[in-house]
Amino acid sequence: MGTIIRTADWFGVKDIYCSPQTVDCYNPKVIQATMGSLGHVRIHYLSLPKWFAQLPPSVPIIGTLLDGKNIYTPNAFPKNETCIIIMGNEGKGISDEIKQYITHPVCIPSYALGSAPMDKPESLNVSIATGIILAKYREL
C-alpha cells in the first residue's frame, strides 16, 4: 500500500479510495514505504459498492481485468482528465460486486516467454501494476 501511495503521488493522484479490508495506511511499514507521500494523497476507507453506485454515469471507471483491452492498443483509456482506476487484490482480482461498475476494462499484457502456464508469472504485484497503469494513463 505504501508503494501505491507513493506512486500515486508521483503521478498526481490526489485521492485513493479503499475498501475497509485494505491495509491501514497508518501501519508503520506503509508509512515508511510512502516516503512522505501520505501527506500529499488523501486515503478514504469506505464501502466501494455504495460509493460507485452514487457516482455520475459520466465518470469513466477503468478496471484492470485479465480479459480487458490491452493497455498498449489505441483508445484503451478514456481521454478524460478525471477518472477512477480500480486495482484489484493480487490474489483475487476485482470482485464481481465491483466489476459491474467498470466502463473501461484494461489489461497489462504479459510478454513472458514459455508455452506452459507454469513457465510464466501468473500476475504482477499490484503496486507495480498501478505504476504501469498510471504511467500509460498519463500519456494521454
Locate the predicted segments by residue.
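Active-site/ligand-binding-proximal alpha/beta "capping" segment
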Residues: I62-P121
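Structured adenosyl-cofactor binding patch, chiefly the S-adenosyl-L-methionine
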Residues: N27, Q32-G36, D96-L140
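Active-site-adjacent beta-strand anchor residues
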Residues: Y45, G88, S127
